[in-house]
Regions:
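Alpha/beta-hydrolase superfamily serine-hydrolase fold, recognizing
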Residues: 1-295
Length: 295
């Protein structure tokens, strides 16, 4: 069979993938000692293979943090997310953070900020527009991008690449924990007050009930201030989430509204934690439209 009339090309950008190390962190002796190299994967639109040449030298960029209950991540599990956004015309930088078993809070938010600064430091080589950078994360990654985005260049922080800013244009939070002090107020399958639960481990292996001040310090909602600028934020949460209660997003949305912050909230009615609903084209379209309007 010969196809003669091919019609018009309507495919999106082909995507190149490569991996780098964005920082080497020292691990304290209490958590085993030594050091760890933290990788970051870049997904970049490829112009050379486009049927019509386009004069683009720098792309809007999304730094993505994959959720893991603050434990070890399997970053490339979300390959479909990264590629499906990158092919629409974004650089996606998917980072690995230190897991809570070797470095509890505030390690993850510090790693996220360091990754943003690394992207800015190497912007020309990576074809990144330094003035158009957003954060996106799911679950504990959502918590991390909220922490990092709400605090920007203020603490908790590190001095790695400190000559570059960690501030971002927008944040996309998919079903992240927003108030660690209130996780057990609503039904879920986790014991979030236990030292052995994800939040207890993130706080250093302690009980949330015994250390409410530390739990509050690790909660993104704590860092909202009326007189401090906050990046526009898109919240998306599944109505059937049994891991992170839907109310966590409600609490954040309500607080941001009270403080006059720019925030959008989308409920995926039958969405569960990280699966049904979030891998659909509709969800990707929502993310893309939000990024287009804020980057």
């Amino acid at each position: 069979m010969v196809v003669d009339d091919l019609g018009e090309d309507d495919f999106l950008y082909p995507v190149m993938i490569h991996q780098e190390t964005y920082v080497t962190r020292v691990i304290d002796k209490m958590h085993g000692g030594g050091s760890t190299d933290l990788p970051i994967w870049f997904f970049t639109p490829r112009l050379n293979d486009m049927p019509v040449k386009r004069n683009i030298t720098a792309w809007p960029t999304v730094v993505f943090v994959r959720g893991s209950g603050f434990g070890p991540q399997t970053v490339l599990d979300y390959l479909n997310y990264y590629v499906r956004i990158a092919e629409r015309g974004y650089v996606v930088a998917a980072l690995q953070y230190r897991s809570s078993n070797i470095a509890p809070f505030p390690a993850q938010m510090q790693d996220c900020k360091t990754a943003v600064r690394y992207v800015r430091k190497h912007a020309k080589r990576l074809h990144v527009d330094v003035n158009r950078i957003g954060l996106w994360g799911d679950s504990s990654g959502g918590t991390t991008v909220l922490q990092a985005g709400f605090t920007g260049d203020s603490g908790p922080d590190t001095d790695v690449y400190s000559e570059y800013s960690a501030a971002v244009n927008c944040i996309i939070d998919w079903y992240g924990v927003t108030d660690m002090t209130a996780m057990n107020y609503y039904p879920n399958i986790m014991d979030n007050n236990s030292p052995d639960g994800p939040i207890g481990k993130e706080l250093g292996g302690i009980s949330v009930l015994d250390h409410p001040d530390l739990a509050a310090a690790a909660s993104p909602i704590t860092y909202l201030r009326r007189d401090v600028p906050t990046p526009p934020t898109l919240i998306m949460h599944g109505g059937r989430d049994s891991d992170v209660p839907f109310n966590q997003s409600c609490r954040l949305f309500r607080r941001m509204k009270e403080l006059g912050k720019e925030v959008s909230f989308i409920k995926l009615n039958d969405g569960t934690h990280g699966y049904y609903g979030f891998r659909t084209n509709r969800a990707m379209d929502i993310v893309d439209m939000y990024l287009q309007s804020h980057l």
